[in-house]
Amino acid sequence: DQGAGDFLSSHVYFKPYRFRRDKRGRAVILSEFGGYNLREKGHCFNDVDFGYKKLPDQAALWQAYEKLYETQILPAIPRGLCATVYTQLTDVEDELNGVLTYDRRVVKLPADRLRGLNRRVLDASPKA
């Protein structure tokens, strides 16, 4: 965060996210987090295998993703966390940390469980 604009932007990958209010009263956004890596053979651009945390299979990826939300994101919402951006929606050339593979043919996280977790995020959010 550069200290300007309408929101405090944080990128957190290597340590647990700890919510903190902005001293200027701006909205607090976790604008990059996660980055969990899962290689789906046959669905990658090349052999480069970058991600912030490598997981062996879809079950382990889901467990890590769900734990991340349950221990860090959901508790921060009532305290004032306004938005999050998981890294990342799709794999790209040299990064395998997407929810979808590079070719968009494999969804790495179970859609029904992801929908349920997203519902919990919405339910935890303050009502206007």
Stretches found by the model and what they are:
Residues 1-105:
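Substrate-binding/catalytic cleft of secreted carbohydrate-active enzymes
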Residues 101-127:
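Catalytic cores of secreted or luminal carbohydrate-active enzymes
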